[in-house]
Curated annotation (Swiss-Prot):
SUPFAM superfamilies: Thioredoxin-like
InterPro entries (UniProt xref): AhpC/TSA (IPR000866), Peroxiredoxin (IPR050217), Peroxiredoxin_AhpC-typ (IPR024706), Peroxiredoxin_C (IPR019479), Thioredoxin-like_sf (IPR036249), Thioredoxin_domain (IPR013766)
Domain Thioredoxin positions: 4-165
Extra remark beyond the main annotation: The active site is a conserved redox-active cysteine residue, the peroxidatic cysteine (C(P)), which makes the nucleophilic attack on the peroxide substrate. The peroxide oxidizes the C(P)-SH to cysteine sulfenic acid (C(P)-SOH), which then reacts with another cysteine residue, the resolving cysteine (C(R)), to form a disulfide bridge. The disulfide is subsequently reduced by an appropriate electron donor to complete the catalytic cycle. In this typical 2-Cys peroxiredoxin, C(R) is provided by the other dimeric subunit to form an intersubunit disulfide.
Species the sequence originates in: Bacillus subtilis (strain 168)
Catalysed reactions, semicolon-separated: a hydroperoxide + [protein]-dithiol = [protein]-disulfide + an alcohol + H2O
Record protein name field: Putative peroxiredoxin YkuU
Residues of the active site: 52 (cysteine sulfenic acid (-soh) intermediate)
Localization: Cytoplasm
Length: 180
């Protein structure tokens, strides 16, 4: 049975990544916390697939909205940084990613995917998990999708904004509406 994570401290991580500059570097939850940033951490199964580029590029296309909300976006798969870079360097018209505005991290030892409960052990790939972590490192939101279904960026932004209100948000709440 899966352990509850929401409301608890999120598992800490540091991973190699391809940064928005296309340089290799590292990303960590600690760095986001030190910078007083929210973290939108999402896992996807693998590079060079069909659904993944649609959601990865959609998140990048809306990155400025996340940035306006003091949130850093980090995409994660179990692929290597070299595979990530090759995919980023592939044009979107050819099922590539093109330039991204946030890092893609490489969880090659599967440790982070396992700690967040999204690793499909027998396949060595992650489910589509989405985790929103506040600047204090507390996991505020988690959802896991079947790998055939891409995420909704509008919903991710709505949930992030709802969490940032600090209030009670009723069903179908939209940014700008009153909380309870």
């Amino acid at each position: 049975m899966a352990e509850r994570m929401v409301g608890k401290q999120a598992p800490r991580f540091e991973m190699e990544a391809v940064l928005a500059s296309k340089e290799f570097g590292k990303v960590s939850l600690e760095e986001n916390m030190k910078n007083d940033k929210w973290t939108v951490l999402f896992f996807y199964p693998m590079d060079f697939t069909f659904v993944c580029p649609t959601e990865i590029t959609a998140m990048s296309d809306r990155y400025d909205e996340f940035e306006d909300l003091d949130a850093e976006v980090i995409g994660v798969s179990t692929d290597t940084i070299h595979t990530h870079l090759a995919w980023i360097n592939t044009d979107r018209k050819e099922n590539g990613l093109g330039q991204l505005k946030y890092p893609l991290a490489a969880d090659t030892n599967h440790e982070v995917s396992r700690e967040y409960g999204v690793l499909i052990e027998e396949e060595g790939v992650a489910l589509r998990g989405l985790f929103i972590i506040n600047p204090e490192g507390e996991l505020q939101y988690q959802t896991v999708f079947h790998n055939n279904i891409g995420r909704d960026v509008d919903e991710t932004l709505r949930v992030l904004q709802a969490l940032q209100t600090g209030g009670l948000c009723p069903a179908n709440w939209k940014p700008g509406q009153k909380t309870l």
